[in-house]
Each structure stands twice: as C-alpha cells, then as structure tokens.
Regions:
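Conserved loop->alpha-helix
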Residues: 1-181
Length: 181
C-alpha cells in the first residue's frame, strides 16, 4: 500500500479500518501499518478469525475522480457468511434477513471484493469468479465452511428505507413467492 498515511482508510477483507501507525518500506524491507479494531468490529466481522500471516484482501478507498470498476463499497460489513461451495462457482450462505437485498445480476461484496450475483437464494447467493479474480484475491482459495465478510448493496438499503415511509406498517411485505417486496 504505497503512500499510506496516518488516518487513511484501508479495507481489510472488506472491513474499513483507519491507519493508526505505519512505516514505509525501507531498503527492500517491507513496510507495515496498524489499525485499531473495536469490539463491535470483531463481533460483526471475521477479522477475529485471522492469524498472523493469513492472506487478506487489501484495498484503498476510491477517490471521487477515479473510475469505478464495480459498485459502491463502503467497508461497512453487514454480516459474516459461510462458503458452501468453492470457486469458481462460489456459493455463500448468509443471514436470511439480508437476502432481500440480494438480486440476480445485482452486486454483493464478499471479503471486500465487488461481485455480480449469479443466483439469489433463500439463504444466500452464488457468484461466478473469473480466473483473474480468483487469482488476485483470497476468494480463489476459500474452502467450504470458511467465514467471509459480506456487505450488501447500500443502495438497496436506502431504497427500502425511503419506501418504508409509504408502506402501511413501515416494513416490506412478503410476496407469494417468499421474496421481500
């Protein structure tokens, strides 16, 4: 992470953290940085499962002038999901209360990686990882049972919140097919 500075946001497996200490690379030696992780973050993410040396997905925030190569990802993890099928046809089980925000051909973030949903399921979703994504992220080596951080598309949450004000009980209703509407 060239150019990282004190106070910068950096996503670790999709979880936005703030750099609180750092040292740049010197004479070929690797640089490093540190972040504080709150109890709240540990309780809502899989960061507590990491051991020293575990590979992680690292990403710096996009600047407003940069090209957006996926969807808007905040680094605010909604839940931890569980891998039920490995790449390339990755399947993830998640809290059914969040599946209403997952739609076929929509976006989902898995461990910080913006992905397109192939299949929306009652208890999760599937995505198809292209070889490049599998090679340059940790998703290509994830195994069945591994925990992953999930962030649903924030736009869907905002739309639901805005529409809820116009619904009789302020909540989405169940459609006959069992999907939220």
């Amino acid at each position: 992470l060239d150019g990282v500075q004190l106070g910068d946001s950096t996503a670790v497996n999709g979880c936005c953290l703030t750099v609180v200490a750092w040292e740049p690379p010197v004479d070929g030696a690797a640089g490093w940085w540190e972040a504080d992780v709150s109890d709240e973050t540990y309780s809502r993410t899989s960061l507590g499962d990491l051991a020293p040396g575990d590979p992680v997905n690292l990403e710096r925030p996009v600047r407003l002038m940069d090209r957006l190569g996926g969807h808007l990802v905040q680094g605010h993890v909604d839940a931890v999901g569980t891998i039920t099928a490995p790449a390339p046809d990755l399947a993830v089980r998640m809290d059914p209360a969040l599946t209403r925000y997952v739609v076929e051909k929509g976006s989902i973030t898995v461990d910080g990686v913006s992905l397109t949903v192939v299949g929306a399921l009652d208890d999760g979703f599937t995505v198809a990882l292209i070889p490049h994504t599998a090679d340059v992220t940790t998703l290509g080596v994830r195994k069945v049972g591994d925990a992953v951080n999930l962030e649903v598309d924030v736009t869907a949450k905002y739309v639901e919140r805005l529409l809820a004000a116009h619904l009789p009980d302020g909540k989405p209703t169940e459609s006959p097919e069992g999907n939220q509407s």
